[in-house]
């Protein structure tokens, strides 16, 4: 999900291809597909669907949980309201934003709410960054990742409400469902009862599950968690220096707890194993899930993210006078003599100027595009430790409806796979009563990112054979593959390893008029969709607070954001 830049004329052809391949949110270039010739029935079906009118859906899954009265939701709502109620600027700032993922979209949305005029530039021809998706020749969508919207995402939930699209979230029953590797084809559930408040509903879910953890293991795990419960956020942040495995050993938590629960959780949160993941990441998730009644409740988007989530944000931005441009890749950050930003130079030769600039693309791209005069500034130097993690998203269309699955997210507990879902069940736009489409996160992916798609599919099928022993075999003697798509993201969210927290930057940089947005920037939700949206709000807040300074700053003083050919 990340990309790189700082391109010179000499290496432009190579760099452009490299950038495209690593473009934020993964890229279509890296998403290859394969079709079995006998899929005419599938082609006929999808052609009919692709010629239909606009998607018409009404959410009829589990009713939307009552989130509006939670402390975190109200806090997020207050921050959103502060932009709408901010004094209208005498002359709106023209803010140029690079990157139309959730962080860039959020930044532009809230700046527009505050009365300013964002110009949002996206390098590719698709919105969404890490939630980008593409439609194939049959009209079927394939995505950068398997995206889950938690009740514990207050800023994301507010965003849906502000856009009037709450009905586009398909809420699932309040459960976490894990495959049982020792019992192929079987699952174990953690069911959270609605009648109990937090944290009792979470405690009840853990205590009632006797298939994954024994009572002595549960007790030792609970004792190990006591310092986090008592110490609060300060304790959580102090654990950044320990990996999950190190923390568990330090707290005397049995190793089997890590094996049974936290390998799956680590891979789901950051695509890496618990011997690498910072314990802070796990504790933040547990904190939200245990303190909020509906925190761990999950929802799927009812269709593809670019159309069902990103476009409503774009429509909102444009309705308030902002602009959004695709196919506008940053080649260079050009500086004034005093080291401030003069313009963004695009790969098409155009320059874009404004009153303020936001870099909302992933951290790996920023590091490649960072101007030489900035590289030794501590604020930017610390970014060296922040590196995107590779991940692979796999989509497989089968010739039949698989039975051993649920209308929910499933934790595979496989060595190669993380979470997966039968999207023909969980998502209205992808619904199919006759055939299953499994979307699977292949992680950790570092050793596989350079392998061929056929290698990845072969390995995936061997894992699926364990999850569907009666329905899938690796040699396809049972369910047959009609087609597949493999989307490789060489650099996704930043790798949340120990001691990263001090390296995460504030949204306001030391360069006057230059700001950052992205889940790697400082906010409490780490690498997530919620973190991206919140970072955009913090970035917008910084710009609104700096209005007088930006309005009075030298040659950029309230200039129109311009795009000029060079």
Swiss-Prot record:
The enzyme's E.C. designation: 1.3.5.5
**Gene Ontology biological process terms from the UniProt entry:** carotenoid biosynthetic process
Q: Where does FAD bind?
A: 103, 122-123, 130, 147-148, 153, 330, 519, 529
Q: Name one GO cellular component term.
A: membrane
Which keywords are on file for this protein? Answer: Carotenoid biosynthesis, Chloroplast, Chromoplast, FAD, Flavoprotein, Membrane, Oxidoreductase, Plastid, Transit peptide
In which pathway does this enzyme or protein participate? Carotenoid biosynthesis; lycopene biosynthesis
Membrane-spanning residues: none
Q: Where does substrate bind?
A: 288, 527
- Cofactor dependency: FAD
Q: Where in the cell is it found?
A: Plastid, Chloroplast; Plastid, Chromoplast; Membrane
Q: Which segment is the transit peptide?
A: 1-86
The enzyme's first-digit EC class, named in words, is oxidoreductase
Query: Coiled-coil segments, which residues?
Result: none
Reaction(s) catalysed by this chain, per the record, are: 2 a plastoquinone + 15-cis-phytoene = 9,9',15-tri-cis-zeta-carotene + 2 a plastoquinol
Major localization listed first in the record, in broad terms: plastid
| Topological type in the membrane | Peripheral membrane protein
Q: What domain of life?
A: Eukaryota
Q: GO MF terms on file?
A: phytoene dehydrogenase activity
Q: Name one Pfam family in it.
A: Amino_oxidase
The similarity comment for this entry is:
Belongs to the carotenoid/retinoid oxidoreductase family.
What is its quaternary makeup? Homotetramer.
| Protein name in UniProt | 15-cis-phytoene desaturase, chloroplastic/chromoplastic
Which source organism? Arabidopsis thaliana (Mouse-ear cress)
What is the taxonomic lineage of the source species? Eukaryota, Viridiplantae, Streptophyta, Embryophyta, Tracheophyta
